[in-house]
Amino acid sequence: MQEHQLSRVTSGNKKKYQSFDDESRDEKRMKCDSTDKLESNSNSKNIYQKTHRVIANIRERQRTQALNQSFSTLRKIIPTLPSDKLSKIQTLRLAAMYIDFLRHVIRRGEINMDSSDETFFSAQERLSYAFSVWRMEGDFYSRDKTAHYFTEQELNLCEYNFHSSFGNRLFYKAGIEAVNSADSDDITCILNTFLEGRI
């Protein structure tokens, strides 16, 4: 009978040990599953962050390229000098000056904008020239500067050399033929204009 009881106790203990083993296995499995889930969540979070960073970098690169292209286009539109190496802020300031200059020219009605292409481009060259000379009178960034705005007659006395490899950068020279064909009073007037820094 004792043997029978002992075998019962032993088998009962085995069952207890087995149930403890089963529980510990289940706990280990659950821990492993939760660890796997955490690792999986961590990996997916890392992948999301990397993807988000890559997309943000692409957007920033595209924004920078668009901005640079816009500034490049603006530099081609505004008259510049061969010596200009303009930063972005200087380009914006120069564009603002050019807009102000054009506003004054339009207000005074100094340039006749004809519908003919040849006249339009001639007027555009004269405006570019006048702006560049106006810009060189005194301090480039001075607010209280009193600028001379050219009359159409003064603009007509100028000749332009456009250098294609420099975009819209103009190299200027005085209208020699205009000086040669003018009478002495006109020459004196042109020389005075040169001395005053208008051309």
From Swiss-Prot:
SUPFAM superfamilies: HLH, helix-loop-helix DNA-binding domain (SSF47459). Keywords: Developmental protein, Differentiation, DNA-binding, Nucleus, Transcription, Transcription regulation. Residues 51-102 form the bHLH domain. SMART domains: HLH (SM00353). GO terms for biological process: cell differentiation. It is found in: Nucleus. The keyword Transcription regulation applies. GO terms for cellular component: nucleus. Its main location: nucleus. Expression is seen at the point of medusa formation in the ectodermal and endodermal bud tissues, and in the entocodon which gives rise to all smooth and striated muscle cells. After the subumbrellar plate differentiates from the endoderm, strong expression is detected until the medusa detaches from the gonzoid. Expression is observed in the distal part of the medusa but diminishes in entocodon-derived muscles as the tissues differentiate, with expression disappearing completely after stage 8. Probable transcription factor, which may be responsible for the formation of myoepithelial cells in early muscle development in larva and the formation of non-muscle tissues in later bud stages and mesoderm-like structures in the medusa. Efficient DNA binding requires dimerization with another bHLH protein. Homodimer. This is Twist-related protein. It comes from Podocoryna carnea. The lineage of its organism: Eukaryota, Metazoa, Cnidaria, Hydrozoa, Hydroidolina. The gene is TWIST.
